[in-house]
Amino acid sequence: MATEAQSEGEVPARESGRSDAICSFVICNDSSLRGQPIIFNPDFFVEKLRHEKPEIFTELVVSNITRLIDLPGTELAQLMGEVDLKLPGGAGPASGFFRSLMSLKRKEKGVIFGSPLTEEGIAQIYQLIEYLHKNLRVEGLFRVPGNSVRQQILRDALNNGTDIDLESGEFHSNDVATLLKMFLGELPEPLLTHKHFNAHLKIADLMQFDDKGNKTNIPDKDRQIEALQLLFLILPPPNRNLLKLLLDLLYQTAKKQDKNKMSAYNLALMFAPHVLWPKNVTANDLQENITKLNSGMAFMIKHSQKLFKAPAYIRECARLHYLGSRTQASKDDLDLIASCHTKSFQLAKSQKRNRVDSCPHQEETQHHTEEALRELFQHVHDMPESAKKKQLIRQFNKQSLTQTPGREPSTSQVQKRARSRSFSGLIKRKVLGNQMMSEKKKKNPTPESVAIGELKGTSKENRNLLFSGSPAVTMTPTRLKWSEGKKEGKKGFL
């Protein structure tokens, strides 16, 4: 039990010394989740798209790479793996036949040194990386060579796939560091692959521009980081995994440079030939680009904690792809859509505010209009029977064909319910207080209710005028019969 407790405590202790280690997921230990931690991977949809639809994923990433760096047709074809890399001096990677033959021989022997990179090989090499993380303060680490005899013993053990007890004191840190460099140097191609060679040269040339649009000599770090993030996304998975482990180790080593005397640039000089340089070339072949390659390697070491996160717009594109939405092809598309959404929201908010502000004013105007009309009709109603009174009543009935000023109903409301907001209907609703109307009809009288009220209280002449002049009024047989039965004894409402 003590052994188990000690082994369980080793991981936090080891991680506590590596506070800046790369972490691509977040663990949530919520007590309400029955003690089961939930892992949130921000690049979940990116990884899902990479594994399930590699062609779509590659097209998405490459289209954004070409937005940042200029790749002519041949270099773009090299990045896509359609043509082989052409190097100065006629040098080039070994032919596919010889590479396959050499790999087959090594595979038969079960060796990992000199074989194509695999996850099994990375698992063996990880023992070296893990040991070096505990010995970062050794002066001259990765620069001082170790003992060749001990290195051969260690090499054979790794090729045989046996677990090695590096804590026994049999091996020195310099032995392990040198063997790690040997492993990288014997890979069939550099860790960053031949296909990406020209792209890394272009990334090293990304410089800032001044206010006049002229290119300066100041590196554009943000664009370089973004381009490297994209480029690392299309690396083969074994290469990407080992590169992540290696850069993290070198980053932690450079942080202890006050003890080990190894800065990021010094480490870049040690590892650029194994990580970036194409195979079968010399320093003379790369004399024009050797400074760029070394500086590029140093830049990757310094910013390694940012390089293995997918850009936010790539995450969004991958997420939208699986949510059934339109997939944007670049960062500019997403920025444009976000801008459109913001403007639409602001416009809708402004329109809503205007409608709210105008409602009290409209209601107040309508109230004053209704009060004035009610007083006017009450005055006409109180007049003695005369020709003048009948003439005024006819004028009120004619106004039933026009709508109340300032209260134009919408087209959809007219088509749906065919309501009429006329002067005559409005007056009769306020003055007569029709008991047959519901509370809702008191505010919006229908043409049928207007017609019924007029039939009950108007003379035959006015009824003829009303029905002949108002095409909006319709009478059902039931209501017409009811109204005719009531007209005896009620000749008029005046």
From Swiss-Prot:
Polar residues bias: where? 399-415
Compartment list: Nucleus
Under the heading InterPro entries, the entry gives:
ARHGAP19_RhoGAP, Rho_GTPase_activation_prot, RhoGAP_dom
Basic and acidic residues biased stretches: 354-368
Region annotated Disordered sits at 349-368, 399-421
N-acetylalanine sites (modified residues): A2
Q: Point out residues bearing the modification Phosphoserine.
A: S7, S31, S422, S438, S470
Where the record annotates domain Rho-GAP, the positions are 102-308
UniProt protein name? Rho GTPase-activating protein 19
Q: Which organism is it from?
A: Homo sapiens
The lineage, from the top, is: Eukaryota, Metazoa, Chordata, Craniata, Vertebrata
Gene that encodes the chain: ARHGAP19
